[in-house]
Structures are given as C-alpha cells and as structure tokens.
Amino acid sequence: MRIAELTALLHLASPALPIGAFSYSQGLEAAIEAQFITDADTACAWIRSGLSNVLAHGELPFLAHQIERWRTHDAAALIEGNREFLASRESAELRRETEQMGWSLRQLCASLEWGDAARRATLASMAPIAQPTAFAFAAIAHDAATDAALAAYAFSWVENQAAAALKAVPLGQLAGQRIIVALREPIDAAVRQALSTSPDDINTFAPQLGILSARHESQYSRLFRS
C-alpha cells in the first residue's frame, strides 16, 4: 500500500474527522438500558455481533459496491444504491444518523476539493446522502483499494462503538483497548465476507437492533443521538 493511500484512509477513519460520529451509538446505548450490555465482556460480544452479523452482510458490502460504482462513475447505479441504503434504515434515528454523517462528509469532500469535478457534481446531486456513499467517494478520490477502504470503515465503526461503551457502561480505557484488539481479526473476516457478497445478497435484517433503536428515541436519559 502506498503511504499516501494509507494516510488518506487513516484520515477517513480518524475520530477527529468532523462528521459527528462521536454523537451516535447505533443502538448500543439502548442495549445498555435493556441490560444486554453490563460489562466489558458483554460490550465486546455486542460489538462483535454487530460487526459480524450486521456490518459484514449489509453496510460493508453496500460500501464495496458503491466504491466500484464511483470508480466507473455509474451515476444512475450510485443514486439507486444510495436510495436503497437509506430505505434499509430501520428507525428514524438510524436514518438521521447516516444522513447527517453523509452530509457532513460530503461538505468536507467539497471544501477540500477531493476527487474530480464530474464526480463531485454527482455527489452534490444526491440529497439526502448516506454516509457509506460519501465515504466511498472519499476513498475513490484518494485511489484507495476497496478492501483497504472497507477495513478502514469497519475499524472506525468498531472504535466508535468501543468509545460509546466507555462512556455509557461505563468502562475503563484499558477495557476499551482490549475490545478493539479483540475485534481486529473479526474485521478482516467481515471485509472478506463483504467482498464476496453480491448486491442481491446484501442483508440488513437486524430486528433486535431496529427495536432497540426505536426504543432509544423515547429513552429517558441519553448520552447519544442513536
């Protein structure tokens, strides 16, 4: 991997990227309220399940196919894929999350003039835009390999989930680092699963997550927006 590609992906995966990821827990806070998560071990198991059963079969393969569509600049397929991903969000919170983060990342891409003008015009035409669609654009703008881009996206998700667990369970810093270390190999497996998934086989079925996310909307005390 080229150094420029590596640093670009580190940038996109960084918690310092100003797209608001820190304000979302993607149902983890509701899982704590429901006592599915009570300590470091149950937090790790929850995040592992989300990575292996939700991201690997849904969000990551969608991202992989959007990357290839950006690579060939198939605007019609990009727009349709973006619509399908938005339609797959199972609660208002999850829908607003991907729209807000997608919008913020698109604004960043435009402000930094990433990519060529034609692709930026296609990016600007999508409203609302899902975060994976915007992330796929940013990856292509830096000529990143698809597998490396998926690994960066998955690691960013795991890191954000661990950070949310630290605040909401709460856990110590070392426990959070153990979660991240424990999930490095599952990230590799999730990426390989995603790369082998055709568009017709993408699966976003996660009823427990959808129910918890809907319950989170009226949860009495919350730190996170999802």
Curated annotation (Swiss-Prot):
**Keywords, comma-separated and alphabetical:** Chaperone, Cytoplasm, Nickel insertion
Subcellular localization(s) per the UniProt record: Cytoplasm
- Gene3D superfamilies per UniProt: Urease accessory protein UreF
GO MF annotations in UniProt: nickel cation binding
Q: Name one Pfam family in it.
A: UreF
**How is the quaternary structure described?**
UreD, UreF and UreG form a complex that acts as a GTP-hydrolysis-dependent molecular chaperone, activating the urease apoprotein by helping to assemble the nickel containing metallocenter of UreC. The UreE protein probably delivers the nickel.
Question: What is the protein name stated in its UniProt record?
Answer: Urease accessory protein UreF
